[in-house]
């Protein structure tokens, strides 16, 4: 997108194994989000309000699974499974940074490196 206030925000996100994107939701403001995997392999997790995994989807172009749609207000997160993974993210605009209440309180903050490592290991075992 050309401007942060465009009605649709689109971005390419290049991710490597070990990248931590804290589980979050898009509730305030409510926004659906779409991930299209262009290359690599990524696990997409959906969670309930307690942090329990309710759904796991492996995005893998080699298997013909290219995308996931996340409904507004749904807790979600990713685990990068293959080096060189690139996703195309599409979300309603205008861009708004995530408010603190949109980060999952049951997930470790990025600066908690030990907690993040343990959490990512748990996600990996859930696949």
Residue ranges with predicted function:
Residues 1-25:
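A short glycine-rich, His/Asp/Glu-containing loop-to-beta-strand
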Residues 34, 48-73:
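Short acidic-glycine-tyrosine-enriched beta hairpin
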């Amino acid at each position: 997108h050309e401007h942060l206030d465009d009605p649709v925000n689109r971005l390419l996100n290049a991710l490597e194994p070990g990248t931590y994107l804290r589980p979050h939701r898009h509730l305030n403001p409510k926004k659906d989000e779409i991930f299209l995997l262009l290359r690599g392999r990524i696990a997409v997790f959906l969670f309930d309000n307690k942090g329990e995994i309710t759904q796991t989807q492996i995005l893998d172009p080699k298997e013909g699974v290219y995308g996931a749609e996340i409904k507004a207000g749904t807790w979600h997160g990713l685990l990068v499974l293959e080096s060189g993974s690139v996703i195309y993210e599409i979300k309603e605009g205008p861009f708004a940074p995530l408010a603190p209440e949109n980060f999952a309180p049951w997930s470790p903050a990025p600066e908690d490196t030990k907690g993040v490592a343990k959490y990512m290991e748990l996600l990996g075992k859930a696949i």
